[in-house]
């Protein structure tokens, strides 16, 4: 997820080569419903810097019945390495259900062919823990105001972390499809569906607690950009 699309970012860079600027995007601020307990989910980021170097702050998480189930915050230094790609390094903090975890992060962010927005990051934590995360998004503009946004995300872990109910290997797959209406570019209500599938050992942890390994949820929310 990018604070603005990389195409917009390149246009901004061409208009103003030297100035430092910033942006704040709350890409998902939504309510999710699957017939059971409703959840509040957020995903957002902010950045500040010039054309070549930026400081990024990313956060995402989920609250269920007033309790933070899972959340993460990343602080990253972003360096442009080509017209469409940047290298990112920094830290990530996980909190919520289970003990907190700290990670060092190294990844890339940019535009793949056909304007797919890609984030791919590797992580190293204490006690020999490793992880990886890949996310792909695409904005399909139907009209000047209507935009369809499909997305997919995968999380992998190098070793099991029973305290956080995470298994080794592919832990989960998340896919979503949202239709937003841009009343203004900075303010867009949306609705859609989100699907999550727990995999391998992570799914086994869930089943041991009589929880399902997959869920399909209706979502409705706001996208805000400052």
Sequence positions of predicted segments:
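Repeated loop/turn-to-beta-strand initiation elements of outer-membrane beta-barrel proteins
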Residues: 51-57, 83-87, 114-118, 143-148, ...
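Transmembrane beta-barrel strands of outer-membrane/channel proteins
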Residues: 28, 57-61, 89-93, 120-124, ...
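Outer-membrane beta-barrel initiation region
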Residues: 1-67, 71, 75, 79, ...
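Residue-level signature of outer-membrane beta-barrel architecture
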Residues: 48-50, 79, 110, 124, ...
């Amino acid at each position: 997820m990018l604070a603005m699309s990389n195409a917009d970012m390149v246009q901004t860079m061409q208009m103003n080569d030297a100035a430092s600027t910033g942006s704040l995007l709350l890409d998902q601020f939504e309510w999710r419903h699957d017939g059971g307990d409703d959840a509040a989910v957020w995903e957002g980021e902010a950045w500040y810097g010039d054309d070549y170097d930026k400081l990024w702050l990313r956060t995402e998480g989920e609250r269920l019945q007033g309790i933070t189930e899972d959340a993460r915050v990343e602080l990253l230094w972003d360096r442009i390495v080509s017209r469409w790609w940047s290298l990112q390094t920094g830290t990530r903090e996980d909190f919520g259900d289970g003990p907190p975890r700290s990670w060092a992060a190294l990844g890339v962010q940019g535009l793949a062919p056909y304007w797919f927005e890609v984030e791919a990051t590797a992580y190293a934590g204490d006690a020999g823990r490793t992880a990886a995360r890949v996310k792909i998004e695409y904005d399909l503009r139907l009209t000047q105001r209507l935009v369809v946004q499909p997305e997919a995300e995968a999380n992998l872990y190098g070793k099991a972390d029973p305290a956080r109910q995470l298994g080794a290997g592919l832990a989960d797959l998340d896919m979503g499809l949202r239709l937003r209406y841009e009343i203004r570019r900075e303010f867009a209500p949306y609705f859609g569906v989100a699907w999550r599938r727990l995999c391998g050992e992570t799914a086994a942890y869930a089943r041991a607690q009589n929880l399902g390994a997959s869920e399909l949820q209706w979502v409705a929310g706001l996208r805000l950009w400052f």
